[in-house]
Amino acid sequence: MRTIVLFSTLMILVLSCMSNATVKSYSEEKTHSFDLTANPPIDLNIVDELPRDEHLGVSHADNVIGFCQECAHHCLQRKRVLGECRWFTCHCSRITIGVGL
């Protein structure tokens, strides 16, 4: 009987500490703001950062996500990083990908 009481008391203490820790971590996550007005985007000079539009040829994509996947594949074939993909316009960055490991 004594071990049951001791075990249940210990279990209650552990569970209460765990619940306090999870509430604290949840409240910290809520304080992070993803609002663009609070965190303005980085001001990049896009003319210098991105070259001209990349022409992918015939695109078989039905939506923007599929088009951007084709854009990323196109940039990787040219050993470049995907710069920007918006409104069915593909830009590969000027940054090249290293060939060897």
From Swiss-Prot:
Q: Where is the signal peptide?
A: 1-21
Question: Which compartments does it reside in?
Answer: Secreted
Which terms does the UniProt entry file under GO BP? defense response to fungus; killing of cells of another organism
Any one GO cellular component localisation term in the record: extracellular region
* Domain of life, per lineage: Eukaryota
Q: What is its main location?
A: secreted
Report the record's disulfide bonds.
C68-C85, C71-C90, C75-C92
Give the record's keywords alphabetically.
Antimicrobial, Disulfide bond, Fungicide, Plant defense, Secreted, Signal
Q: Point out the coiled-coil segments of this chain.
A: none
Q: Which family does it belong to?
A: Belongs to the DEFL family.
Q: What is this protein called?
A: Defensin-like protein 222
